[in-house]
């Protein structure tokens, strides 16, 4: 059971909340979180780098000069890897970098990473009604009242996000702020942020989605 204080829009403590998420054992926690992080970063690779071998480069079918008698080194093709414009030896080819991780392990890693950041977790009341219109300045001021240091990396987790939502429109222009929905939780964002701000409703949704 984890306890955390709840702050309002003005940054005042207005209550406490508790949540419970099953995490990995202490001796295996860092290992499973590391596996999930490596999987996420590896799966983000496009894997479409491609070079041409001497067989794929256009031209080079004719022997550039006769084998003997010219005084130059023998050559069989102008597309030899030794030549400028020739093929590439052992160059990259399109490949699949995807790593597999069981669903139970992925969820366990997410829960472990989330609970592991409890010291940097800031729980706030729902504040969408506080922004009557998109206003980045007001959201930046609220983050400062909640304890997010300017220029530090912050992760803001909402229960859901709409493109027309005032919170989304206010947050998208803040350089070091990442905005995600509760069902978009991922290990990289949890570990990368200096502070994690989560609304009370998003915290409930996280328990609902990831508790199993």
Swiss-Prot record:
Assembly behavior: Part of the 50S ribosomal subunit.
Function comment: One of the primary rRNA binding proteins, this protein initially binds near the 5'-end of the 23S rRNA. It is important during the early stages of 50S assembly. It makes multiple contacts with different domains of the 23S rRNA in the assembled 50S subunit and ribosome. Forms part of the polypeptide exit tunnel.
Gene3D superfamilies given in the database record: 3.40.1370.10
UniProt keyword RNA-binding present: yes
Keywords for the protein's UniProt record, in alphabetical order: Ribonucleoprotein, Ribosomal protein, RNA-binding, rRNA-binding
Biased composition (Basic residues): 60-71
Identification of the protein by name: Large ribosomal subunit protein uL4
Protein's GO biological process: translation
UniProt-annotated stretches for the region Disordered: 45-71
Entries under SUPFAM superfamilies matching the protein: Ribosomal protein L4
One Pfam family this sequence matches: Ribosomal_L4
Top-level taxonomic group: Bacteria
Gene: rplD
InterPro entries: Ribosomal_uL4, Ribosomal_uL4-like, Ribosomal_uL4_dom_sf
Species classification: Bacteria, Bacillati, Cyanobacteriota, Cyanophyceae, Nostocales
